[in-house]
């Protein structure tokens, strides 16, 4: 029996959540409903010794169970992200990423979603890969992701701005 697209998506979200949380660097919140621009909200588990904050980021998950999930020419995962979805994700003020999932191998491919011209309409690159059962290799990539999220938030100087914000309420 073939899986429905909703089930394929749900399985993909679980795979991404597992890969992100397996090293203890992140916690992932499953939203439990359809959000137009993203599927997961993730948060850094702060290292209190490094005075880190629980900075958050968004993830749009695209999954496939296709027997041939990669393009032949350049080996990109055939999990297209339509421009309207990409733009909606980029419009959110949090750092945002796309995770493509090959359900045949449970491998997760991460790409940044900051650039409207990224070109994920037909497929996504396989450069940043999280492999099931390869925690050592995954840790290095997840540390890059963590640093990326921290750099984003620190670049906004949110730690200075928020305490000085004057609410109208």
Task: For each feature predicted by the language model, list its residue ranges.
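Mixed-charge (Asp/Glu-Lys/Arg
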Residues: 1-36, 41-169
């Amino acid at each position: 029996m073939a899986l429905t697209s909703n089930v394929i998506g749900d399985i993909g979200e679980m795979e991404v959540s597992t890969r992100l949380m397996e090293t203890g660097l992140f916690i992932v919140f499953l939203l439990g409903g359809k959000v137009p621009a993203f599927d997961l909200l993730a948060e850094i588990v702060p290292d209190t010794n490094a005075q880190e904050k629980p900075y958050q980021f968004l993830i749009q998950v695209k999954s496939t169970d296709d027997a041939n999930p990669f393009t032949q020419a350049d080996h990109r995962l055939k999990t297209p992200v339509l421009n309207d979805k990409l733009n909606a994700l980029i419009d959110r003020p949090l750092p945002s990423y796309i995770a493509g999932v090959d359900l045949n191998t449970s491998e997760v491919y991460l790409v940044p979603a900051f650039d409207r011209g990224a070109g994920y309409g037909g497929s996504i690159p396989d450069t940043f890969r999280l492999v099931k059962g390869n925690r050592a290799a995954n840790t290095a990539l997840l540390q890059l992701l963590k640093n990326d999220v921290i750099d984003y938030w620190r670049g906004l100087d949110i730690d200075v701005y928020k305490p000085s914000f004057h609410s109208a309420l």
